[in-house]
Amino acid sequence: MTGKKGVFIDLTVTEDETIELLSRGIQLDVLIPDLTAHYKSRNRPAMNRDFPLGSMQGNYTWDELNTRFDELQATYPNIISERIILGESIEERDIWAFKVSDNPNDDEDEPEVLYTALTHAREPVSMMNLFYFVQLLAEEYGNDPELTYLVNNREMWFVPVINPDGYVYNESIQPDGGGMHRKNRRDTNCGDGTNRGVDLNRNYGYGWGANDTGSSPDPCATTYRGESEFTEPETQAVRDFMLSHEFKDVLH
């Protein structure tokens, strides 16, 4: 897209946004016409790598993630706690967390850290990175001095999927991976497709609605912030969990 002569801007836009830009007389050159197909093609080589992957272009499906966590927890119960339920999503799926520490079932006087992932449903790599980090901690505990120190001197909490409904929706429309739905699945009168929902990352209380640049009041926009702060059960669950702990750091 050209802003002024000699200046070009690369943007990721929806079909509706493309139509809007064209209606304003803005010149567009489409570099990647189908992001879903692009990501599926780009991710395919990873299938040959020598570590356990999921069936959705290497990413775990919702069911696979739950199964894989149960397997890891059963193998390493000495440092991985059982899951705790923080709340339910719009479509009544569990939002859950677990702790990695040397005494995972005890509340020790150690600094707490929170890791979260998949606030945006189309960003599965965030969940996969967390999951493999946990797997690394478990497998190297007692062998790697730095990782062992972390486990022994921190209480590390993980919420692998904040937005389960959006993630399952992407799985339903693109079972081979590459689904581009971003928001949760609240009915915002925008149809049943990817325009539906609230952007959970814009629904938290801090700075909510400060402007219409970083978030949108339009229910069909990808950055729709909701009718007010913390309207969504997913953000409420994260808020309440954080208020019940004293996290020193949060990696969101």
Model-derived segments and their meaning:
Residues M1-H252:
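M14 metallocarboxypeptidase catalytic domain recognition
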